Amino acid sequence: LQTYKKEIPLLFETNQMLIASNGRYSRVGSLTAGWDRFMPWRSMSHEEVDTEMELEFMLNGLFNKSMFVEYILDFTLFQNKRDGVVKIIAGYHQYHAAKASLQRTIEEVSQSGRGKIGVIWHTQGSGKSLTMTFLTGLIARNKSLNNPTVIVVTDRKDLDGQLFTTFDASKEYLRQEPVRIEDKNNLISQLSGKKYGGVIFSTIQKFLPKEKNSKMELLSDRTNIIIMADEAHRSQYDMLDGFAAHLNDAFPNASFIGFTGTPISFEDIDTRGVFGDDISIYDLKKSIEDNSTVNLYYDKQVRQLVTKNAAETIDAAFEAATESEEVAVTERAKRRWSRLQSCLLYTSD
């Protein structure tokens, strides 16, 4: 295939996706993807796992005529990389999550804003940033949302930069240039009174009020403002006294959607209080079933406890054993012993 791509590139210009299957197992991926990026096509429940031939499920699902056309239009994007143009297609979990989130967004915005769209919990390494990109594209192009503004909020500069890089590389798919906020003044100039459109990136700390114990100034009361928060499980997204309260002051009629790669307990009232209930769950178990994540094993080791007196005896024996050695050899051995010693637990005598 690589030889054909190199020698007859025109042969693949109209290719939408590649399928590899032996009937029982099937994988789908783009022409520029490595094999590790090929995935099965499933429902989010995984009910069909081990009960149906994967090829049959893929043909009846992804290759259903209406879904296939929609997938090509809305879930395929191109990014310019150093090695050339890369074609990216959505995994089934990204497709289902973005579709469900769009529907929930339309419902919440139609209720005059202040909506809790929900939470997308997709495990680490599952392509969360691309899921956000696909969803932003769907939201931006949806006519019923009247050219909305999407604000992507993170709590760290490095995370903000990573997400912005992904979105910026996908600007042709988004049909607009994303904007990264540099400081508080830039935030106000970009968002104050903004009438429509835009994909804006900012760290949440920029929404702090200018003076302590005061409110963040109103930037827009539009109802079609969508705030996407990454790592939404973190405590700063508290609507009462966290940063989410300042976001709410700035955009009182906005709708919130949270993304997280960390499990959220049902007792986590704050996260669901700000963002709403779960929209999509792609946990570690599902990722392992898709061979996207390697199994994680925990081998419990019970360490033998050593008393302080015993440790002192060992120290003395060590000094005696190394007495005739060169200083360099002794120091090297001491460093090794100190590392081992730090792993031992001591009990009181």
Label every model-predicted segment.
Residues 231:
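Walker B catalytic acidic pair
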Residues 124, 250-266:
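Conserved helicase ATPase motor motifs in RecA-like P-loop NTPase domains
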Residues 1-149, 158, 162-173, 205, ...:
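ATP-dependent helicase/translocase motor core
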Residues 185-200:
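Conserved motor-coupling elements within RecA-like helicase/translocase cores
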Residues 20, 200-202, 255-260:
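Structural recognition of the conserved hydrophobic beta-strand(s) that form the central parallel beta-sheet
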Residues 269-348:
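Interdomain helical connector at the RecA1-RecA2 junction of SF1/SF2 helicase-like NTPases
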Residues 199-228, 236-243:
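Conserved RecA-like ASCE ATPase "motif II neighborhood" in helicase/translocase motors
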Residues 171-185:
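Conserved RecA-like helicase motor-core motifs
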